[in-house]
Amino acid sequence: MSLMVISMACVAFFLLQGAWPHEGFRRKPSLLAHPGPLVKSEETVILQCWSDVMFEHFLLHREGTFNHTLRLIGEHIDGVSKGNFSIGRMTQDLAGTYRCYGSVTHSPYQLSAPSDPLDIVITGLYEKPSLSAQPGPTVLAGESVTLSCSSRSSYDMYHLSREGEAHERRLPAGPKVNRTFQADFPLDPATHGGTYRCFGSFRDSPYEWSKSSDPLLVSVTGNSSNSWPSPTEPSSETGNPRHLHVLIGTSVVKLPFTILLFFLLHRWCSNKKNASVMDQGPAGNRTVNREDSDEQDHQEVSYA
């Protein structure tokens, strides 16, 4: 009986702890840039890798550069482990796509799943483009507005960012018209008020951008929303397929253990019930015998 109780306790412990690996040796950490992923030339940026898993070490790796992997001892603060990588004096050589990994001391060669990629871009290298709004920077809620980024420089790609947003939109430059190269970013409906800037870049150096355009404030009158269209991010209605895959996989793994726990609990209760019935059996027989004896005595008195 004690072995069964111990087994039930162990299964319940794992279910409560949720100790199921998501992917890799440990689940992926998060990678952030402070103050942001767009860094002016010669300025400093801090890349922070953090996780609620207590990693002792973090590794920072830039894609395509094997000799630029940095290792840092993690700090444990308020239930979070983190490591800060400072990139001083930003140059073209340091721009690119970064990922970070976590590891623990007793398994230093087993890394966690990689963090989501983070693009670090150097800005301020080329002539700034111009940013304008059509029909104008002030529109009614529900109306369409188009932001046009243009320059006489032959940029291959234009990037539009909104102040306070982590991601940006990008479009290839259209054919040269009136000695300018232009990309038009439609915002439809016009519920995306905020301050916008645009940048230009060349095809062979996607992480090296121009200077920022002058800021453009788009004002939306009426009922406005701060939603920002992102073709790369799914809406909350459709959900993230990757996240759903993790949830489904975790549920499939937990289901057999849940069934096992139910089976053990049912068997334990059945054994307990059977033991209780066996204990009550002799007492019941003695009661019946006493009743039979009393009934026989009563019959003898009556015949007498």
UniProtKB/Swiss-Prot annotation:
Post-translational modification: N-glycosylated, glycosylation varies depending on the allele which alters cell surface expression levels.
Residue ranges with Basic and acidic residues bias: 288-304
Subcellular location: Cell membrane
Name the record gives this protein: Killer cell immunoglobulin-like receptor 2DS5
Assembly information from the UniProt record: Interacts with TYROBP.
One Gene Ontology term from the biological process aspect of the record: immune response-regulating signaling pathway
Extent of the signal sequence: 1-21
Record family assignment: Belongs to the immunoglobulin superfamily.
Sequence ranges on the Cytoplasmic membrane side: 265-304
Organism: Homo sapiens (Human)
Residues glycosylated per entry: N67, N84, N178, N223
Domain of life, source organism: Eukaryota
